[in-house]
């Protein structure tokens, strides 16, 4: 029997994130039906369905949080999705999300994709900073706004079903770059009498001070002029590459996290972009 209620939903997938999502809805008073390949992972209070098909049939709102796009398709394949609101919180690419939207729609369902900007411990925690990008069917988003706001903040980025995935991966990519820089920095100080615990606050403060550069990059991309307002141009920055590389060599640290970006900087200068900021590198990546 299907439940048409804004206080009931189904969750497919009970990994760390799926379990955290489920617990947040249970704590908010929702009736949650769950399915997982290992039913023993079900949080206390959830109703465990024997099959994915049974779980989907139970509620109109179905949240999917599985390993990848292939797992989503394998789980939903052959299940009647007529009248179902499928909210996919599985990490995917823009193209995968768009294709999955068509796949779900062709089977009678409505589709909303999501990109979770949080780790499981942040889910359901007030003021944790957690939020989810959503994109896809506007009416689905509006109809389920209350339920979707329970685990984390909501940022709806448009009707294109691929946009949530793109925002998600773009920000994760920026984070990967930050992690790479931090790894290199900690490696540099590793041989010296410098406490990582004392160094960490300096790194955080410096990264925060530099983070605003993104606004300048965005403005330059919008204008198409990469030289306006530049204080340290690309040619000047490239001259420091040698110092960074020599320091790494002296400290016995591999520079493999730095050299790909340095190569792009040098290439842009060689092509005449020496007076630009690092924004010019964006064009090289888009070619």
Functional labels for PLM-detected ranges:
Residues 164-260, 264-285:
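Helical "substrate-binding/catalytic lid" subdomain
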Residues 25, 104, 148-149, 189, ...:
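A generic structural signal for well-ordered alpha-helical segments
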Residues 32, 48, 110-112, 196, ...:
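Hydrophobic beta-strand scaffold residues
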Residues 1-61, 84-85, 120:
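NAD(P)+-binding Rossmann beta1-loop-alpha1 motif at the extreme N-terminus of oxidoreductases
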Residues 52-110:
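Rossmann-fold NAD(P) dinucleotide-binding segment
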Residues 92-173:
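Rossmann-fold dinucleotide-binding core
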């Amino acid at each position: 029997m299907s439940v048409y209620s804004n206080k009931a939903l189904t969750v497919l997938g009970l990994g760390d994130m799926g379990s955290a999502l489920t617990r947040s809805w249970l704590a908010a008073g929702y009736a949650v039906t769950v399915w997982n390949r290992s039913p023993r992972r079900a949080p206390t209070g959830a109703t465990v369905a024997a099959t994915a098909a049974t779980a989907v049939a139970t509620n109109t709102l179905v949240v999917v949080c599985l390993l990848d796009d292939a797992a989503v398709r394998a789980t939903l394949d052959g299940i009647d999705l007529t009248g179902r609101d499928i909210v996919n919180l599985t990490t995917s690419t823009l193209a995968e999300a768009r294709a999955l939207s068509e796949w779900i729609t062709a089977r009678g369902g409505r589709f909303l994709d999501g990109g979770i900007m949080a780790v499981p411990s942040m889910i359901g925690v007030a003021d944790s900073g957690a939020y989810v990008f959503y994109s896809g069917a506007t009416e689905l988003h509006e109809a389920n706004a209350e339920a979707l706001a329970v685990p984390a903040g909501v940022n709806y980025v448009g009707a294109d079903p691929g946009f949530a995935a793109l925002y998600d991966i773009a920000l994760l990519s920026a984070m990967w770059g930050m992690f790479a820089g931090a790894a290199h920095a900690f490696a540099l100080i590793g041989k010296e009498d410098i406490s990582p615990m004392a160094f960490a606050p300096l790194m955080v403060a410096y990264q925060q001070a530099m983070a605003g550069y993104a606004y300048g990059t965005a403005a330059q991309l919008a204008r198409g002029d990469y030289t306006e307002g530049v204080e340290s141009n690309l040619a000047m920055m490239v001259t420091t590459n040698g110092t960074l590389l020599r320091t790494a060599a002296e400290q016995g640290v591999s520079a493999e996290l730095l050299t790909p970006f340095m190569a792009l900087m040098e290439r842009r200068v060689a092509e005449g972009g020496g007076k630009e900021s690092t924004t010019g590198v964006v064009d090289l990546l888009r070619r």
